[in-house]
Amino acid sequence: MTEQTPAAPVVRRVDPRHRYEILVDGERAGLTAYRDRDDRRVFFHTEVDEAYAGQGLASILVEQALTDVRASGMRIVPVCPYVAKFLKKHEEFADITDPVTPEVLEWLDGQLKR
């Protein structure tokens, strides 16, 4: 009998839902949510399902999401604490990162109340 190796996680951008999702064996294991403001992608929430905790999926998800932001020519605003923490450890994204300002927080609050 042979053991099946689990498939590598897949990250996809789901524009209608304003988020990136990470899939494991076709099942959504986590997400990072955003709203776009002009040329900036404002990340405000990241979560990984408890069943998938401890596998490094949040890091994979955020790294691939930020790589996609760079490829699209946009900038990052890390309102989400996890994304902010990730960026402190990964300086390769510093050139496309903007600070979180009161103006951005007020705008985001308005977006999320819709």
Model-predicted regions and their roles:
Residues 23, 44-45:
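Beta-strand residues in well-ordered beta-sheet regions across diverse protein folds
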Residues 32, 46:
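Conserved GNAT-family N-acetyltransferase fold
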Residues 2-31, 67-71, 75-77, 81-114:
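Terminal substrate-recognition subdomain of acyl/acetyltransferases
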Residues 47-53:
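A short, internal acetyl-CoA/4′-phosphopantetheine-binding micro-motif in the GNAT/acyltransferase core
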Residues 36-44:
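A conserved beta-turn-beta hairpin within the catalytic core of GNAT-like acetyltransferases
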Residues 54-66:
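Conserved acetyl-CoA-binding loop-helix of GNAT-fold acetyltransferases
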